Amino acid sequence: MTREKYESLPLATLKELAKARKMRGVSGLKKSELIDAMLALDEKEEQKEAATEAKEEVREEMKEKKAETDIEHLDSGYTANGILEVMQDGFGFIRSDNYLPGENDVYVSPAQIRRFGLKTGDILTGNTRVKTQGEKFSALLYVSTINGLRPAEAMKRKNFEDLTPIFPNKRIRLENSGSSTAMRIMDLVSPIGKGQRGMIVSPPKAGKTTLLKEVALSVQKSEPHMHLLILLIDERPEEVTDIKEAISGPNVEVIHSTFDELPEHHKRVSEMVIARAKRLVEHGQDVMILLDSITRLSRAYNLIVPPSGRTLSGGLDPAALYSPKRFFGAARNMREGGSLTILATALVDTGSKMDDVVYEEFKGTGNMELILDRKLQERRVFPAIDIPKSGTRREDLLLNKEEQEAIYIMRRAMNGMKAEEAVDNLLNMFSRTKSNAELVHQVIRQKFI
């Protein structure tokens, strides 16, 4: 307090204050003497506080310096970069190769996971701690980036489940300069939008893998910023190599689990891929998963789920379909920004009743279907697309008015034809025109195909 404030108080109040501050011999003092004594005590206390603050500042500086020297001392100099897998016990590991456990995995502590709100599927970068003799894995010292963003920015994201799904309304163009007839047909007959849940239904040897590869290359050209995840389950090793070499880029990841791997391996890989896609969508990015095939993934789950006591025809346990349906059902367009597009292949006419049951279970869940026809394939007509049966739900949100009119004319004309005749006629039209725009104008002008 200042002298003026003390002087404004009555003597009795001043004496009470002095007693509260444990000052001795104040009862016989005059008011002016008491005020002088109070001011002297104030000055002493201020000096003590200043000295204490200075000591605390020195201590904090020493702590910071010690922490910096500790980090420098503990820092191994190696930067960890990979996908995080959070285990049931709360800790996690940064996986590097093909999203699976390996010797070079990096341990992430539960405290770091809680502090930054980390989830399975996050891509982390950060320096590792010096490995001691008894440690099997290196440990993450500090987090530099989460999914390419600073930790403070990455923590602001919403949960995938809290985002609002809407119908796909932004088209992914598959037709590019020099694109194949298959891509032109697909772009017109069954267009794909951002957030589409599409299925390519195919008998064996009908060209489904080639079609997926063409889709991936077209998406790379038309949507260079879209993150492309190609998941190959139960495929041949040579096909994995072929796709890896054909499709590469900064936003492309080819994840595989070949037919010689265990079903648990298939399950783990697929769960890591869908977690990775969800984390990207939470940050408002557009992601596309090309899955080959959902039938083989369902077969793998059928072997590892605990028996439910019920069996569908073909020996399929209904409980085995929950996880593949959760995978396929994650595809959606988000109102808040970002989208997850899934294009999966389903096998039919393989001679296995189980494969047909899996297809029947997934039949109504997608919002786009492309049917490949065995008869066309036997006649060596490629692409072997059954055009009358293929299509997209709510295609009016993706096609313009002219394209809608042309498709209406084409479908009405094909109604009475056999599938082979319809495809032959259409293939002739596609070969005579250089682009889909030209084909649309020609169909509208002629009013028939």
Residue ranges with predicted function:
Residues 178-235, 274:
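P-loop NTPase nucleotide-binding module
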Residues 130-200, 206:
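P-loop NTP-binding catalytic core
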Residues 1-79, 83-91, 99-104:
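Charged, low-complexity terminal tails
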Residues 62-154:
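N-terminal "pre-motor" subdomain/linker immediately upstream of P-loop NTPase catalytic cores
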